[in-house]
Amino acid sequence: MTNREEIERRRTFAIISHPDAGKTTLTEKFLLYGGAIAQAGEVKGKRERAAKSDWMEIEKQRGISVTSSVMQFQHGGYCINILDTPGHQDFSEDTYRTLMAADSAVMVIDGAKGVEPQTRKLFKVCALRNIPIFTFINKMDRETRDPLELCEEVERELGIDTYPVNWPIGCGKEFAGVYDRDKRCILHFTDAGHAKKAGITEIELDDPALVDLIGQARRDTLADEVELLGAGRDFDLDAVRHGKLSPVFFGSALTNFGVEPFLNAFLEMTTPPLPRVSDAGEVDVYSPEFSAFVFKIQANMNKAHRDRLAFMRICSGKFERDTEYFHVQSGRKMRLSQPQTMMAAEREIVDEAYAGDIIGVFDPGIFSIGDTITMPGKKFRFSGIPTFEPEHFMLVSPKDTMKRKQFVKGVEQIAQEGAIQIFKIPDSGFEDVVVGVVGTLQFDVFEYRMKNEYGVDLRMSGLPYEHLRLIRECPCDVKDLMLCSGSRVLEDFKGRKLIAFGGEWSVGFLTKHNEGLILDDWLSV
């Protein structure tokens, strides 16, 4: 294949949802239908067989995704890159960064609950980029709300038009299949077990045999609903690809009903890799010159090797192993000799990759979130990835002072990942650090990782801070600043000084009583 043909067949998308809507289960079933796994993890439960996309030990224990997973597989002539994101709101920053690497999104909605708070937040991030958003209304094997009501809620709550591509036949125990509006036929499902592919029988709406399958009453109700749908808006693929119209599909990820038709239709409708914006203008994905940006850093994916991977989204051209590339932020040339594609924690060395692909490269400590990698001689930078301002803070120290070395290593590595903000206290060495997070569950993950990955038990105590400001200009030594109660000077791992405040009043006090002090808000950080 030519480079262009390889890029054209790439499909890179994220899966978003509110917690417990079935996002990870749907991801599993995509892998099942794509042939990437022979049996879905859902069937035996978390204890016997953890979900393929949940690789961190704490994820398997708690049954939630707390870090983004990357999975690549082939299906139907497409090369698919799935970005499975944390659904829990406490990990929204990792999700936000992952969405920056996606070309489209699958939004999973619980059919019994409809649009939920985290769904709204994640949808807004996707909408800002105008990427295609596909809706999968899940859990049709349980009692759900009225399908038409659910579509109307998506339109009302999220401000996007919808088009039901298929329509459910019943719900709960009565869920028997879907009507495919494009093929104008019923896809009747037969249960093959949750871990295996569902059987599908295609039958026309006016086929007398349909009554034997679903009964006369349901057949008549379906005919009325199909007629009602026909009076609605027409399908517009261009509107879909510009994020203005969301195709809606119904199914059950748990029973596999409706998953395969959704996957096949989604791959046909969604876009190949989209162009990216840099400080030198839009970068053409079909350019022969390689470029990429770092959207995630993860330490200790393999505890035996104590390694750290930088995840890169390729934005243009073709990546080739052992070729010399340029790291724009450091101004250094480098050879990436062991690039890897991922299936959660499992890896495979690759010799080449194309625009749209996600690769992981070993990071000796030079990469940061948002960094740009190009061909030598090219110095443009892709638009940066902002971080969320921490809302909760704790003072952290090792219980065993003899483990200070392990404590420092763990703190430094986790800080470089960027999902949890860690600050030093000036002139105090590493006796204590201040940890800032968006959601309090991240404290649990930090504590767990420090113990599990670095062997350090922590002493943690809450702090009253609510805001952070970066010191841009200071008229004196920071130690001589007049601080009010509940404020403290901190230092990040780039050596920049910040001030933590207990409230907005404290910010005003500081600038009023320290003439010449100029502070920047968190977005500047």
Where are these regions (language model features)?
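Structural and coupling elements of P-loop NTPases
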Residues: 1-525
